[in-house]
């Protein structure tokens, strides 16, 4: 059991787990997440993903929902356990050890430290007092003794690794909570249509009505921005959302995710305007909508109407695929199959993405703790001891970070002590 705990808390195991989680996240970014199963089968039927995985294998490996898959959550749990064990076995004892005072009593003990210096002075005890005063002004914590001194600075840096581990655990807990308890809903909503969100008991939680939807396009006709004006059932003021500017309301985040064409208004002959639903035709292109429209009362002699934007034009094709004419929304009628056909309007639809993720506050807290711990980890923990003996002041020190800089600062510190001596006797500095 002890060997298992030692292995789980090994830093190398945590690094391997982090790499696996990063690799899994990259896969989740490369493969679309949350689409219908048939879309993966169709997408990877002829061209397997990376030349290895067909659609069925993608589904079997749960790569269509990586972040909520059992194996991904298992990796997060394993990493969380490894971090907790590492903190318990390594970081917590290191913090406790840093908080304990070590009492070095003899010059011989100091000479074995990573940094050691000795100055010769007529009054070593006065030099010890001067050293204590200099260190106190620099913010060191002191513990004086009989003819000796212990000092430390930056012990708070030892808290940094613990906070880093705590932040990572909180972050992973928030991610798991969001994956298990969160909800995601994608819907296309036409203007003046309402989307009702129901609780598990069937009660209405929130109603969202699309009051207006605008598509901003560049001079070439490419969409640049989408804007939706939403009316919420529990709010008197409409809220506008756009790409990269979502709405957060009662724990639900509403994103402007996409757009589509919902319906087309046509007039055949002297008929009133007929609003007919459009459907997508992926075989004709990524963003092609259309419908089959009969031109006779018995449903015969149909024509096919297709368009790529709400601005048109609307292409009209015969049943054999030959082009008949082009129609502009709101423009004049054109004769098709002996009847005047006019496109009165095209109704766009707003693609809304609704997310409820209860783990987000925990994720934010985890990031904050992680950043705080990372900052504190940069603080070097320095320890210094001094012993006055036989007209000499022996000084030694340890540092867990940037030892070379501390080794350069220690002689300068001793020079300040020497400069404050009130005696005129010669002094020398020797490296031990």
Swiss-Prot record:
Subcellular location(s) per record: Cellular thylakoid membrane
Keyword Transcription: no
Ranges that cross the membrane: 11-31, 69-89, 159-179
GO terms of biological process kind: cytochrome complex assembly
Predominant location category: membrane
Keyword annotations: Cytochrome c-type biogenesis, Membrane, Thylakoid, Transmembrane, Transmembrane helix
GO terms for cellular component: plasma membrane-derived thylakoid membrane
Alphabetized Pfam families for the sequence: ResB
Highest rank taxon of the organism: Bacteria
Membrane topology: Multi-pass membrane protein
Function: Required during biogenesis of c-type cytochromes (cytochrome c6 and cytochrome f) at the step of heme attachment.
HAMAP family named in the record: CytC_Ccs1
Family, similarity comment: Belongs to the Ccs1/CcsB family.
Assembly: May interact with CcsA.
Full protein name: Cytochrome c biogenesis protein CcsB
Name of encoding gene: ccsB
């Amino acid at each position: 059991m002890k060997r298992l705990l030692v292995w789980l808390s090994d830093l190398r195991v945590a690094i391997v787990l982090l790499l696996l989680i990063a690799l899994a996240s990259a896969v989740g970014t490369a493969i679309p997440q949350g689409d219908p199963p048939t879309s993966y089968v169709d997408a990877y039927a002829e061209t397997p993903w990376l030349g290895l995985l067909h659609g069925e294998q993608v589904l079997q490996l749960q790569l269509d929902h990586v972040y909520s898959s059992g194996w991904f959550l298992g990796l997060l749990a394993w990493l969380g356990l490894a971090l907790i064990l590492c903190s318990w076995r390594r970081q917590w004892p290191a913090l406790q050890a840093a908080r304990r005072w070590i009492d070095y009593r003899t010059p011989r003990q100091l000479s074995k430290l990573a940094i050691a210096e000795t100055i010769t002075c007529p009054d070593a005890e006065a030099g010890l007092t001067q050293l204590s005063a200099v260190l106190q002004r620099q913010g060191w914590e002191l513990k004086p003794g009989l003819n000796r001194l212990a000092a430390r600075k930056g012990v708070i840096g030892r808290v940094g690794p613990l906070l880093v581990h705590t932040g990572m655990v909180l972050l992973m807990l928030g991610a798991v909570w969001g994956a298990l308890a969160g909800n995601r809903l994608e819907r296309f909503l036409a203007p003046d249509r309402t989307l009702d969100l129901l609780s598990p008991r069937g009660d209405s939680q929130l109603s969202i009505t699309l009051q207006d939807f605008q598509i901003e396009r560049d001079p070439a006709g490419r969409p640049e921005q989408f804007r939706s004006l939403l009316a919420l059932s529990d709010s008197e003021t409409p809220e506008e959302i756009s790409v990269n500017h979502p709405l957060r309301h009662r724990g639900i985040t509403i994103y402007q995710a996409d757009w589509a064409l919902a319906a087309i208004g046509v007039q055949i002959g002297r008929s009133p305007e007929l609003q007919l639903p459009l459907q997508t035709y992926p075989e004709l292109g990524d963003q092609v909508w259309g419908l089959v429209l009969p031109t006779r009362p018995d449903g015969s002699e149909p024509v096919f109407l297709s368009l790529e934007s709400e601005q048109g034009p609307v292409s009209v094709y015969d049943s054999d695929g030959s082009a008949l004419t082009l129609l502009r929304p709101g423009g004049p009628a054109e004769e098709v199959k002996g009847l005047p056909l006019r496109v009165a309007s095209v109704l766009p639809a707003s693609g809304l993405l609704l997310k409820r993720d209860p783990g987000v506050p925990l994720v934010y807290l985890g990031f904050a703790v992680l950043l705080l711990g990372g900052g504190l980890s940069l603080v070097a923990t320095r320890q210094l001891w001094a012993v006055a003996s036989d007209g000499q002041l022996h000084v030694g020190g340890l540092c867990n970070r940037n030892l070379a800089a501390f080794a350069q600062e220690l002689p300068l510190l001793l020079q300040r002590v020497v400069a404050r001596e009130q005696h005129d006797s010669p002094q020398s500095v020797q490296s031990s």
